[in-house]
Amino acid sequence: MIVLGIETSCDETSVAILSDGKILSNVVSSQIDIHKKFGGVVPEIAARHHLSNLPIVFKNAIDMANISIDQIDLISVTYGPGLIGALLVGISFAKGLSLRLGKPLIGVNHIVGHVFANYITYPHLKPPYIVLMVSGGHTEILLVKQDDEIEVLGKTVDDAAGEAFDKVARILGLGYPGGPEIDKLSKNGDENKFNFPRPMMDSKSYNFSFSGLKTAVLYTVQKFDKDNVPKEDIAASFQKAVVEILLKKTFKAAKDLNVNTIVLAGGVAANSYLRKKAQKLSEKQNIKVLIPPLEFCTDNAAMIAMAGYKLYKKGISSDSTLEAVPNLKI
């Protein structure tokens, strides 16, 4: 089965083609440089660029896969969560293509896409497994019981982890996006220099909170003269606190539920410190941890195509009434 995936939920325009779960093409056009000067994604600008980029990215994906559009068997598209204007561009394109080709359409939850990105690298992965889903907009611990049955065990009660990274990067005067900037800066810092709070880390629930940690960083920065802020040490200490919170909760969930596999998903899963610490804990606690390659952590259409492929095989599909749902939940 040849599946076309379309992803336009935020600031990446992406089209991918999979054949029975194997990637034939995965083209991503990023808008990071466009939004960098604004310090974040501007929804209207993002939507306009999706509109102009999508036909070009689509053609490139078809050419790279070396197929004709008539060979496409299924069209899979992100319908939420995300920016309403950006989502509508992808959905409208997918609907038009489905109508033109007479091929089935399936709407995919962007978060489920991130989870299912792991099937690309780990095709033998089977439920049940625990997911640490960490991105700019979402931080959740999920239990995948079946491909079409995912339970939210815990989530952030305020900022997402990626959002906290961006806000702390801004406090430190770093560029956008903040996650990679802090990751890079931390490599030259002392992670034990500042003992930042770990909100909710020892609570019985699997929920997270990062706003208090972010505020603690702000107060610490304000104690220093503007030109003498130890940015490397603050970044490293902050990053350590976030990762400890994330991993303690996730491994607790795996132990409590007697699930022996944890997978990482989402943009923050690209963080080198998180990846390293997750691997170390895996060996220490004898729980398997699967970490996606960097290109499948950030937004891409291959993950949407894979999710569509898996769910369509479960008998799930959409029709022409498919609409964008900006605040879509799992």
From Swiss-Prot:
Keyword Iron-sulfur assigned: no
GO biological process: tRNA threonylcarbamoyladenosine modification
The enzyme's E.C. designation: 2.3.1.234
Catalysed reactions, as listed in the record: L-threonylcarbamoyladenylate + adenosine(37) in tRNA = N(6)-L-threonylcarbamoyladenosine(37) in tRNA + AMP + H(+)
GO CC terms of this entry: cytoplasm
Subcellular location: Cytoplasm
Keywords, ordered alphabetically: Acyltransferase, Cytoplasm, Iron, Metal-binding, Transferase, tRNA processing
Cofactors, names only: Fe(2+)
GO MF: iron ion binding; N(6)-L-threonylcarbamoyladenine synthase activity
Enzyme class at the top of the EC tree: transferase
Top-level taxon of origin: Bacteria
Record PANTHER family: TRNA N6-ADENOSINE THREONYLCARBAMOYLTRANSFERASE, TRNA N6-ADENOSINE THREONYLCARBAMOYLTRANSFERASE, MITOCHONDRIAL
Annotated HAMAP family: TsaD
Family: Belongs to the KAE1 / TsaD family.
Physiological role: Required for the formation of a threonylcarbamoyl group on adenosine at position 37 (t(6)A37) in tRNAs that read codons beginning with adenine. Is involved in the transfer of the threonylcarbamoyl moiety of threonylcarbamoyl-AMP (TC-AMP) to the N6 group of A37, together with TsaE and TsaB. TsaD likely plays a direct catalytic role in this reaction.
Name of the protein this chain belongs to: tRNA N6-adenosine threonylcarbamoyltransferase
Naturally occurring in which organism (per UniProt): Thermosipho africanus (strain TCF52B)
Gene from which the chain derives: tsaD
